[in-house]
Regions:
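Seven-transmembrane-like multi-pass membrane architecture, highlighting hydrophobic TM helices
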Residues: 1-355
């Protein structure tokens, strides 16, 4: 117990908070590069991969968030949570995709750009922990959407959701400014708390991050297991076909998002304490990228409402009109439009969420 308290006590001196108060210089006791000879390895292929995937995901994610923020979807507490999740996901994607790709491309280590890597690592680690808390909150929200008898449902109703969102917001701020950052090393194309790989020291262990990752794995599995049970029960007893279809979409979206988060959390905890071959470390880095990218991929592939609005946002009006004129017109189109409208109304009335 005393060991854990010691590791947590030196978080402040190893954190972004100290870095900013010390004239944007990391603590010399923990992050002194004087006399350190640690050369990186240029990773041009992986560097280009991470940067290209990051740009692609951001080009999809940002329009999705714009659509969500401007649409009636924001009437749902679920989408208010998703909007905040999207904002911190973008911060993480900048770090684990664009910055990771660039640093890997040039073969950088912590001592190559200590100030820049320290700052980026603080943002990346803090926003990752914040996204974990937000995902758990989202899972609880979805459970209460389906089972209205859960007492916690009241914290998502009306203006209460704004106070509830302060929980992941404060947790994100704490994680960014008051815990140890992750630091890049091109030898493994990943981020570690220890800036000097090969010089082992337990003073770089981030206890808060470890607890966070263990909790997100256990809580996510438990909550989504419960969600699966609720959906299975609803499918057997619900009279509305539209409700059944909506619940299935919720389950698919939740599982896809949860799986990447839990995988990244588990691998990162494991490789901080046990030997991991480079392939496993790289898998963890890709899983971290996928954990934040999966949300917008789910939006654009499974959520017809968001997909339709994104097309409307990105495709010029004259192109849409030209496509509408040249497309084949059949009598089934008004019927399908009516069905979509009815499905939307049914979904709002039953779960408060359009999927």
């Amino acid at each position: 117990m005393s060991k854990i308290l010691y590791l947590m006590s030196n978080d402040l001196d190893s954190s972004l908070n100290y870095y900013l108060r010390n004239g944007m210089n990391p603590h010399s006791l923990y992050y002194n590069c004087t006399g350190v000879q640690q050369e990186g390895e240029r990773r041009p292929f992986l560097g280009v991969y991470f940067m290209m995937v990051g740009l692609l995901i951001l080009s999809i994610y940002i329009p999705c968030l714009i659509v969500i923020s401007r649409s009636d979807l924001m009437r749902s507490s679920c989408y208010k949570i998703m909007l905040y999740l999207g904002l911190i996901d973008i911060c993480c994607l900048v770090v684990n995709s664009l910055i990771t790709g660039y640093l890997g491309f040039i073969g950088a280590t912590f001592c190559s750009f200590p100030r820049f890597i320290f700052f980026a690592g603080s943002i990346g680690c803090g926003c990752w922990m914040g996204s974990c808390a937000t995902c758990i909150l989202l899972a609880v929200n979805r459970c209460t959407d389906i089972n209205h008898n859960i007492p916690l449902r009241r914290i998502f109703i009306g203006k209460n959701i704004y106070f509830t969102l302060l929980i992941p917001v404060f947790y994100t701020v704490y994680s960014v400014f008051f815990t140890k950052p992750i630091l890049f090393n091109s030898l493994y194309m990943s981020w570690f708390f220890n800036p000097f790989i090969g010089l082992e020291s337990d003073k770089y262990v981030n206890v808060s991050h470890t607890i966070n990752n263990c909790c997100v794995s256990l809580c996510a599995a438990s909550l989504y297991g419960y969600l699966s049970f609720l959906i299975h029960w609803k499918n057997r007893h619900a009279q509305s076909e539209a409700l059944s279809k909506t619940q299935k979409q919720i389950l698919i979206q939740s599982i896809l998002i949860c799986t990447c988060n839990a995988t990244a959390a588990f691998i990162y905890v494991y490789m901080q304490f046990f030997y991991s071959p480079p392939s496993v470390i790289l898998l963890g880095q890709i899983a971290w990228q996928c954990a934040h990218a999966s949300v917008c991929v789910v939006y654009i592939t499974w959520n017809r409402t968001i997909r339709r609005k994104v097309k409307k946002l990105l495709i010029p009006k004259k192109w849409r009109k030209r496509n509408a004129v040249t497309s084949t017109f059949t009598v089934t189109r008004p019927i399908m439009s009516l069905m979509t409208s009815d499905l939307t109304k049914a979904t709002w009335s039953n779960s408060g969420t359009v999927f």
